[in-house]
Regions:
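Hydrophobic helical h-region of N-terminal Sec-dependent signal peptides
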Residues: 9-16
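Bacterial N-terminal signal peptides that target proteins for export
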Residues: 1-9
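Ubiquitin-like/PB1-type beta-grasp interaction modules and other compact soluble beta-rich domains
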Residues: 23-168
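C-terminal motif of bacterial Sec signal peptides marking the signal peptidase cleavage site
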Residues: 18-22
Length: 168
């Protein structure tokens, strides 16, 4: 009788425990994770001053992005390149802020979209100070003076436009 009870207990334990022990699926390194898709994005754009003169132009600039190539994502990703060019081209030590550039991201700061890029009465590149997060000119200049973008100063001005020709 004791033997039958012992065998019954063993069978119950085997039924419960064996799947747990035998269910080895291998290491985590064996799991095939799908690679993230990249989107090939092509952008052409011009930055013109208020007279219509093209100041900066890029034709068929190509890059890869994880984000879908909407105009918003294109502007957002593209900004650092444009900013770099503006800092090099603008000899008057003023700055043109264009679109959603991410500056000093590790400290949680984010530069929202600027609506009007402008030139002042002397033709210097300038900005009306309007951003999506309402940074004041003083705040922007304070961040710029730390060398996070380039040596530049934002001033008030007239009219400057960014034209995105589209994405593929």
């Amino acid at each position: 009788m004791k033997a039958i009870r012992f065998i019954s207990i063993l069978l119950i334990l085997a039924t419960v425990c064996c799947p747990l022990v035998a269910c080895d699926q291998g290491d985590a390194t064996d799991i095939d994770l799908p690679e993230r898709d990249f989107y090939e994005v092509t952008v052409s754009f011009q930055i013109k001053d208020k007279t219509g003169r093209t100041v900066i132009e890029a034709i068929d600039y190509k890059y890869k992005s994880h984000a879908e190539p909407t105009v918003l994502n294109v502007v957002d990703t593209y900004l650092a390149v444009v900013q770099d060019w503006v800092c090099k081209i603008d000899k008057t030590n003023t700055l043109t802020q264009i679109g959603g550039m991410k500056a000093n991201k590790n400290n949680g700061e984010y530069w929202g979209f600027v609506t009007n890029i402008e030139t002042d009465s002397e033709g210097n590149l300038a900005l009306n100070g309007k951003t999506a997060i309402n940074l004041s000119l003083e705040q922007i200049n304070r961040n710029l003076s730390d060398g996070k973008m380039c040596d530049a100063k934002v001033i008030d001005g007239a009219e400057f436009t960014l034209i995105l020709k589209g994405t593929e």
